[in-house]
């Protein structure tokens, strides 16, 4: 039977320390509830002595969290321990997490003590914490740079004093997986009473090895891993729990371990943390990045179409991923991907010439970069429109905004070679006003689904790049605009979309003609 690995989440404590602004009470509640749904065993919710606000947050969460064990951090100081316990008084199931520097550097330069004094402080603190709870975790801060002999001594002492979990942090992300595994192995071989406590690890990512170090520690016998969702944390962050969890899941048979995590909640939890912490998830972020389950190479796309397992070791649906794009159409895509997208749109092989379509597809992909389904349709059934000028052109626009938030937009839109349409609308904000005016001008009933703004370059002359996705007749269309003025970039993006919609309509007309 596989042994259970305890998952200890410190997103609300160590993760929050990395944020530019503190989380609000409601944001902390939403993240805590998401972590509970995920099935995290222990949630470290704060450092109560650090501020009155943190104390109140811990107190609030101690009333809300029911299924996971709640935990608070405390230095090995009497006042810290009392305040930590007081903050969690409303919880029936809490842990006090004590920490104290143990490396020569921390002992001498930070704490200004000798190691015997460190052991005395640690033992006294564990004994004090036992007055409030039987669940006590002790962390040897900077264990990765602590001499093994000192680790043996302090771990044996705190376990004897009543610590139920002993944490071995690689506080500055210094060790390699081989080195860290050796440290853990040596502890199990030399600390006499080590089996009387759960041994835990808390790895930082300064050298990019936090997850690898955590897994190597499991191989050595560790039964608790600490980390944060999305790898949040000071400096380079902590071990990313979603990566730890899925590594344990994928290799559960060889590692002979398991967790109580509901992996179906991983994607949702990650998005909640990303949203509230204002930390975008990189496209290529392991497990949760949008590119993880997307394929652009023609060879890979062909392999995925035959069997997803050829190039995917995780089923995206198993972790709650629903909004991923499986096959990106680029100049690297092969015929199999083009054929797959046409079939997905409902077209049979007999409806078009695949070889001709693929030749035209490559030409357009070299110019445009990424190709969408409506581009394929246009190439297959109305190829000539790809070489025509844009039907809609924005001749002029002006936006007047008021402090009330209302903005009035006036636009002049050229339609085809002759028609000029002039429209004015008042709406909430300048971008919405522009979009509503363009909507009225074209009579397209479209819904803005996504708006993304990013800077291309630095300083005041940087270009604003706007990417949008709109829905028209249950179909998504993509648009891009680039300008030093973000309102102009937004307008260009919408006009870009309007042209795609117009071209799509011409394709439909051509299909109707061919069917007659």
Curated annotation (Swiss-Prot):
Report residues binding Mn(2+): 14, 202, 204, 238
Q: What is its EC number?
A: 2.3.3.13
Q: Which residues form the Pyruvate carboxyltransferase domain?
A: 5-267
Q: Which UniProt keywords apply?
A: Amino-acid biosynthesis, Branched-chain amino acid biosynthesis, Cytoplasm, Leucine biosynthesis, Manganese, Metal-binding, Plasmid, Transferase
Q: Where in the cell is it found?
A: Cytoplasm
* Cofactors required: Mn(2+)
The Gene Ontology biological process terms listed for this entry are:
L-leucine biosynthetic process
- Gene Ontology cellular component list: cytosol
> Which portions of the sequence form the region Regulatory domain?
393-516
Annotated pathway, please? Amino-acid biosynthesis; L-leucine biosynthesis; L-leucine from 3-methyl-2-oxobutanoate: step 1/4
Name the major location.
cytoplasm
Q: What Pfam families has UniProt attached to this entry? A: HCS_D2, HMGL-like, LeuA_dimer
Molecular functions (GO terms): 2-isopropylmalate synthase activity; acetyl-CoA C-acetyltransferase activity; manganese ion binding
Signal sequence span is: none
Q: Which domain of life is it from?
A: Bacteria
InterPro entries according to UniProt: 2-IPM_HCS-like, 2-isopropylmalate_synth_dimer, AIPM/Hcit_synth_CS, Aldolase_TIM, LeuA/HCS_post-cat, LeuA_allosteric_dom_sf, LeuA_bact_synth, PYR_CT
What role does this protein play? Catalyzes the condensation of the acetyl group of acetyl-CoA with 3-methyl-2-oxobutanoate (2-ketoisovalerate) to form 3-carboxy-3-hydroxy-4-methylpentanoate (2-isopropylmalate).
UniProt-listed HAMAP family:
LeuA_type1 (MF_01025)
Quaternary organization = Homodimer.
Q: What protein name is recorded for this chain?
A: 2-isopropylmalate synthase
> What is the species of this protein?
Buchnera aphidicola subsp. Cinara cedri (strain Cc)
Q: What gene does the UniProt entry assign to this protein?
A: leuA
């Amino acid at each position: 039977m596989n042994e259970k690995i305890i998952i200890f989440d410190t997103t609300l404590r160590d993760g929050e320390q990395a944020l530019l602004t503190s989380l609000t009470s409601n944001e902390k509640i939403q993240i805590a509830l998401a972590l509970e749904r995920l099935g995290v065993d222990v949630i470290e919710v704060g450092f109560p002595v650090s501020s009155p606000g943190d104390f109140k947050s811990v107190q609030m969460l101690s009333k809300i969290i029911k299924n996971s064990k709640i935990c608070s951090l405390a230095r090995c100081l009497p006042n810290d321990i009392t305040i930590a316990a007081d903050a969690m008084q409303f919880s029936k199931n809490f842990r006090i997490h004590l920490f104290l520097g143990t490396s020569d550097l921390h002992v001498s330069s930070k704490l200004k003590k000798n190691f015997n004094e460190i052991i005395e402080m640690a033992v006294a603190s564990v004994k004090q914490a036992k007055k409030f709870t039987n669940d006590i975790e002790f962390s040897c801060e900077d264990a990765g740079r602590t001499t093994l002999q000192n680790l043996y001594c302090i771990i044996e002492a705190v376990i004897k004093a009543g610590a139920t979990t002993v944490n071995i942090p690689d506080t500055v992300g210094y060790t390699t997986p081989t080195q860290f595994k050796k440290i853990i192995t040596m502890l199990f071989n030399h600390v006499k009473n080590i089996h009387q406590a759960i041994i835990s690890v808390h790895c930082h990512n300064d050298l990019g090895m936090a997850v690898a170090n955590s897994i190597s520690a499991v191989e050595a016998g560790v039964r608790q891993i600490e980390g944060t969702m999305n790898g949040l944390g000071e400096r380079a962050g902590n071990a990313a729990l979603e990566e730890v969890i899925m590594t344990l899941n994928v290799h559960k048979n060889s590692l002979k371990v398991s967790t109580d995590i509901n992996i179906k909640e991983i994607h949702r939890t990650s998005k909640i943390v990303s949203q509230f912490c204002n930390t975008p998830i990189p496209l290529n972020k392991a497990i949760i990045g949008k590119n993880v389950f997307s394929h652009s190479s023609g060879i890979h796309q062909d392999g995925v179409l035959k069997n997803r397992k050829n190039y995917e070791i995780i089923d995206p649906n198993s972790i709650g991923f629903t909004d991923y794009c499986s096959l990106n159409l680029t100049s690297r895509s092969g015929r199999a991907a083009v054929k797959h997208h046409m079939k997905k749109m409902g077209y049979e092989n007999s409806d078009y010439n695949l070889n001709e379509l693929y030749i035209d597809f490559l030409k357009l992909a070299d110019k445009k970069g990424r190709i969408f389904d409506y581009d394929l349709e246009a190439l297959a059934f109305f190829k000539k429109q790809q070489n025509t000028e844009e039907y809609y052109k924005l001749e002029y626009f002006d936006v007047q905004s008021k402090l009330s938030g209302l903005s009035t937009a006036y636009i002049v839109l050229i339609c085809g070679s002759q028609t000029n349409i002039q429209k004015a609308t008042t709406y909430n904000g300048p971008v919405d006003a522009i979009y509503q005016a363009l909507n009225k001008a074209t009579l397209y009933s479209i819904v803005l689904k996504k708006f993304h703004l990013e800077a291309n370059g630095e300083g005041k002359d940087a270009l604003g790049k706007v990417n949008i996705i709109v829905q028209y007749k249950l179909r998504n269309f993509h648009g891009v605009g680039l300008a030093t003025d973000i309102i102009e970039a937004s307008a260009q993006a919408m006009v870009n979309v309007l042209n795609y919609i117009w071209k799509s309509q011409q394709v439909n007309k051509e299909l109707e003609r061919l069917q007659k």
